[in-house]
A protein has these predicted regions:
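Divalent metal-dependent hydrolysis catalytic cores, especially in the metallo-beta-lactamase
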Residues: 2-30, 45-58, 85-97, 113-116, ...
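Generic structural signal for well-ordered alpha-helices
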Residues: 3-4, 28-35, 78, 105, ...
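Conserved, mostly hydrophobic/aromatic
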Residues: 7, 52, 108, 138, ...
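Short, electropositive alpha-helical surface patch
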Residues: 27-41, 105-114, 255-256, 260
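Divalent metal-binding pocket/active-site signature
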Residues: 52, 59-154
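Residue-level marker for buried hydrophobic side chains located in beta-strands
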Residues: 116, 193-196, 289
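Active-site-adjacent C-terminal substructures of enzyme catalytic domains
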Residues: 126-258, 263, 269-274, 294-295
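C-terminal cap of metal-dependent C-N hydrolases
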Residues: 269, 274, 279-301
Length: 301
């Protein structure tokens, strides 16, 4: 409830509540809690559902996700989570190469859950096959996935090549350089890139503050990025979406229409809510954000 109420300060009108890899008990309680809030009522930005990130990830590309809880995907276990969530899981990140015969991928697609490839060691060919079975997006492109190489194209290469696959990308300038952001947006075009913050609950806390994320200690760096104190590895960000928009336009030199689409109509289309979200049209929700020239938020409606 606190997150929903305050995220409007950065111009966000709707979002997915996101989990991380944890034990079955913790994840079950987490999705049940989100469902309770959604159904009991809350103030602020609309919770469109749950983004279930983990535990169906690859060990090598797990990032800051706690490895002791990573498991192979099964339809049976996911059904239990979705039952606890009362059907509110709308988006799942998983390493689809771990999904035997794409069973969970196909089940999710058939039941209205968007499948996004992420924290994955999939090859280019495996990504193409997952796309053919209904995978629709990639989670934080460049990060937590096989890189591009001219002899091993990887997931990054698949993100570029599969034109009609959506791709999230963290636009803080730390997870990916400005040049990498520009390359991705200019290659992908205006319709399939999705800006994300990858922000943690530590958003808004002071520089140098320490927190527990998935059982691991993290610290907030001066640039707003979060790092594991044990290894120094990136563990997310504290980025505000309006600042991400400014970074894309002013630092990464991405055309404004590409940048604004990435945080409005593109994610709405990916989630299948573009009939009421993502653009100002007759009959849609009147979600309006007023920005100053410096991208600071004047008002969110």
């Amino acid at each position: 409830r606190n997150w929903s109420e305050h995220i409007v300060d950065e111009g966000v009108t709707a979002f997915l509540a996101t989990t991380i890899t944890q034990s079955e008990e913790v994840l079950t309680n987490a999705v049940r809690n989100v469902a309770d809030v959604m159904e009991e009522g809350y103030k602020g930005a609309e919770i469109l559902g749950i983004h279930f990130e983990g535990p169906y990830l690859d060990m090598k590309y797990k990032g800051a996700q706690p490895e002791q809880y990573i498991v192979k995907p099964t339809v049976e276990q996911f059904k239990k989570y979705q039952e606890a969530a009362r059907g509110h899981i709308k988006y799942i990140t998983m390493a689809t190469e771990q999904d035997d015969d794409f069973a969970l991928t196909r089940y999710c697609v058939e039941n209205g859950v968007v499948v996004s490839i992420g924290h994955s060691a999939a090859t280019y060919e495996q990504a193409v096959e997952a796309f053919a079975h209904g995978a629709k997006s990639m989670t934080h492109v460049y990060n937590g996935m096989t890189p591009f190489n001219h002899r091993a194209t990887g997931l990054v290469g698949a993100a570029y090549r599969i034109r009609t696959m959506y791709g999230e990308i963290i636009c803080d300038g730390n997870h990916s350089t400005y040049a990498a952001l520009n390359n991705y947006f200019m290659s992908k075009g205006p319709d399939y890139s999705i800006m994300i913050s990858d922000a943690l609950m530590a958003k808004g806390t002071p520089i140098g503050s320490k927190h527990i994320f998935g059982g691991n200690e993290i610290v907030i760096y001066p640039d707003g990025s979060a790092h594991l104190t044990s290894t120094g590895g990136l563990a997310g960000s504290t980025l505000n979406i309006n600042k991400g928009l400014r970074i894309l336009v002013e630092k990464a030199m991405v055309p404004f229409n590409y940048a604004i689409n990435s945080c409005t109509i593109n994610p709405a289309r990916c989630l299948g809510v573009d009939d009421r979200k993502g653009s100002l049209q007759v009959g849609k929700d009147a979600d309006i954000v007023v920005l100053n020239d410096d991208y600071s938020v004047v008002q969110t409606y």
